[in-house]
Amino acid sequence: MILLNRRRIMINPQDRSRAFNFALKMQDIFATFVGLSILWSIYALIFTQIEFIFISKVLLTVICIGFGTLTPLIDFNESHATNPLWTGHARFHLVWQVNAMILTSVLSIALLWFFYSVTNHLIVIFLNYLWIFSFYATVFGLKFFDGELNDINGVPPVLIKVFGRDYEIDRNIQAITGSLFVNSYAVALFFV
């Protein structure tokens, strides 16, 4: 588990813009939506005749919605794209990456729902894993380019309690790990 230190200066909501606070609130709401989607899928598997492929498509769509909406909400504010501590070139690459993620999400949803085929289903699975595994490759390579999961004025961590002990977990780790599990669940449903 990757834990964060406690040197964040934008923990207090009043230190952040309304847009940034809105993005963080939407991320929390979306996490609940993902949880409800998983519960729905379990219900659908046990109590309905809904095809596994359809459930897989819904779960992949949920991931795409997260990649295509939450990423720009979180990244297009003072924590990333307009972060005064970042160089203009770093911001350029961030916006480029986020735009690519948005376009990938739109393409994936179109492939799943408007141009469906088994091949397109597999392409969407692959595209989701591409974003997920490229994130983990970057996390594991942080020491090679002196990178960090978060900046001092970046996104605050998620606070969780495990066996009575408090932990701070980076929101990217939380979101991408959740995406990994949901995407893998969708893959299992696809191949059943």
Predicted feature locations:
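N-terminal signal-anchor transmembrane alpha helix
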Residues: 55-71
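Individual transmembrane alpha-helices with interfacial aromatic-anchor signatures
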Residues: 95, 161-180
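Juxtamembrane helix-break-helix junctions at the cytosolic face
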Residues: 46-49, 106-123
